[in-house]
């Protein structure tokens, strides 16, 4: 009881003096849309809500489209994430989406994903699953490298489906 009272009292003092305590957002934005080019890739993001603090932002209702230089189009939806300004990194929870390249379409999902501007890599550190008409792919750890290259680690499985053409 006493400890909680002191924490609240300190936070109230900081706010009354115009200082925002660490971990508390200083601004909240809703329905944020961003377009950005990073190393030739085009990123479009729609964010339902952004809670911004000093050097960080909590992200909610994330919807991203990434058009890679090689023509691949990745979409990603995630319920929440966090952006860190110091190292220009974003982490998201439970991303899911699609990857298209020409007529090829795969749906994917993962427990987590992270992206760093310095490398422009999209990393799925807790596993990755994808499936489409051609087959299915699972990895314990997956990195999407610019150019559309996927590197799988910690065990990977690929299943190709038989696509026999049937004529009548």
Language model features by range: what are they?
Residues 1-168:
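Mature-chain termini and adjacent capping regions
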């Amino acid at each position: 009881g006493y400890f909680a009272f002191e924490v609240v009292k300190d936070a109230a003092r900081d706010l009354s003096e115009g200082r925002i305590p660490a971990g508390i957002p200083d601004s909240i934005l809703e329905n944020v849309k961003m377009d950005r080019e990073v190393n030739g890739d085009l990123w479009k993001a729609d964010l339902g809500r952004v809670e911004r603090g000093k050097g960080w932002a909590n992200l909610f209702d994330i919807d991203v489209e990434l058009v890679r230089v090689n023509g691949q189009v990745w979409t990603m939806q995630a319920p929440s994430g966090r952006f860190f300004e110091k190292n220009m990194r974003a982490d998201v929870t439970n991303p899911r989406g699609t990857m298209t390249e020409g007529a090829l379409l795969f749906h994917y999902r993962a427990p987590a994903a992270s992206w760093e501007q310095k490398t422009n890599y999209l990393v799925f550190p807790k596993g990755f699953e994808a499936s489409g008409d051609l087959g299915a792919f699972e990895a314990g750890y997956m990195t999407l490298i610019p150019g559309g290259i996927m590197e799988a680690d910690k065990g990977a499985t690929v299943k190709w489906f038989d696509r026999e053409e049937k004529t009548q």
